[in-house]
């Protein structure tokens, strides 16, 4: 469990389906791109993203589980994202699944 973006104080509690804040969308996209490009160090060094990172991950407790998943990734694993959306403006519900196609047919 976890969230790429998890900023409860910034949430729009009255509108679950409001548009994501610009910073939350940018950060979520940055991390997803790092996952797709198999660049886990960018996810580890998320704080290099400055204010977008500080706003998106004000405390890392909900972000750290993602790093365990990336650390368990095998060569050839293909990431998929489902669900993949941001609720309340600042709460990413993006989940990452890694699959190894060559093992699925074995």
Regions found by a protein language model. Give the residues of each.
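Surface-exposed, charge/polar-rich loops and edge strands
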Residues: 1-106
């Amino acid at each position: 469990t976890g969230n790429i973006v998890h900023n409860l104080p910034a949430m729009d509690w009255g509108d679950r389906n409001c548009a994501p804040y610009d910073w939350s969308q940018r950060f979520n996209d940055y991390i997803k791109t790092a996952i797709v490009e198999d660049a886990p160090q960018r996810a580890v060094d998320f704080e290099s993203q400055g204010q977008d990172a500080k706003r998106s991950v004000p405390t890392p407790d909900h972000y750290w589980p993602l790093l365990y998943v990336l650390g368990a990734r095998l060569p050839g694993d293909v990431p998929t994202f489902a669900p993949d959306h941001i609720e309340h403006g600042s709460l990413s519900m993006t989940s990452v699944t890694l699959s190894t196609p060559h093992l699925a047919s074995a």
